[in-house]
């Protein structure tokens, strides 16, 4: 085993160096953080949440202008729309897979609407969807 190196006692600095005055600390601006990897003035980005609340409210005002909606009812309606869209997307994906097509087109969506929604509701949804696609392609 190698011999251990001898440790020398730390040398003391002369008193004169300690007596020097340190510069005063700069005044800090509130809100500006100076840290390791942080950028100045940047706040944590808020995670965006997509909802259908504004569209539900617009439709409600078209149908019944004098009626309001509670936040709990709005949340239920938002969940309902998400569930329906999820079912339609799953059915459209299944149809595309059956037909060995890599793309979901308006035809798959239309067929999935006919399969998922009952009777009269499916007919109205298909007619409104066809009208929307026609308007989109013509513009």
From Swiss-Prot:
Principal place of residence: nucleus
Location of this chain's protein in the cell: Nucleus; Chromosome
One GO cellular component, as annotated: nucleus
Signal peptide positions on this chain: none
Molecular function in Gene Ontology: DNA binding; protein heterodimerization activity; structural constituent of chromatin
UniProt keyword annotations, A-Z: Acetylation, Chromosome, DNA-binding, Isopeptide bond, Nucleosome core, Nucleus, Ubl conjugation
Cross-link (Glycyl lysine isopeptide (Lys-Gly) (interchain with G-Cter in ubiquitin)): 135
Post-translational modification: Can be acetylated to form H2BK6ac and H2BK33ac.
Domain of life: Eukaryota
Region called Disordered, residue ranges: 1-47
SMART domains the UniProt entry points to: H2B (SM00427)
Alphabetized InterPro entries for the sequence: Histone-fold (IPR009072), Histone_H2A/H2B/H3 (IPR007125), Histone_H2B (IPR000558), HISTONE_H2B_site (IPR055333)
Gene3D superfamilies xref list: Histone, subunit A
Residues with N6-acetyllysine modification: 7, 27
Its biological purpose: Core component of nucleosome. Nucleosomes wrap and compact DNA into chromatin, limiting DNA accessibility to the cellular machineries which require DNA as a template. Histones thereby play a central role in transcription regulation, DNA repair, DNA replication and chromosomal stability. DNA accessibility is regulated via a complex set of post-translational modifications of histones, also called histone code, and nucleosome remodeling.
Similarity comment: family membership: Belongs to the histone H2B family.
Oligomeric and partner information: The nucleosome is a histone octamer containing two molecules each of H2A, H2B, H3 and H4 assembled in one H3-H4 heterotetramer and two H2A-H2B heterodimers. The octamer wraps approximately 147 bp of DNA.
Record protein name field: Histone H2B.11
Taxonomic lineage: Eukaryota, Viridiplantae, Streptophyta, Embryophyta, Tracheophyta
Gene: H2B.11
């Amino acid at each position: 085993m190698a011999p251990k190196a001898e440790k020398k006692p730390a040398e003391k600095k002369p008193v004169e160096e300690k007596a020097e005055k340190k510069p005063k600390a700069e005044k800090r601006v509130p809100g500006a953080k100076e840290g390791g990897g942080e950028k100045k003035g940047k706040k944590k980005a808020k995670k965006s949440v997509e909802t259908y609340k504004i569209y539900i409210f617009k439709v409600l005002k078209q149908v019944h202008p004098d009626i309001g909606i509670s936040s709990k009812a709005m949340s239920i309606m938002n969940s309902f729309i998400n569930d329906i869209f999820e079912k339609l997307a799953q059915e459209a994906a299944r149809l595309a897979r059956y037909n060995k097509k890599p793309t979901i087109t308006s035809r798959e969506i239309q067929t999935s609407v006919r399969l998922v929604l009952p009777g009269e509701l499916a007919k109205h949804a298909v007619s409104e969807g066809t009208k929307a696609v026609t308007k989109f392609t013509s513009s």
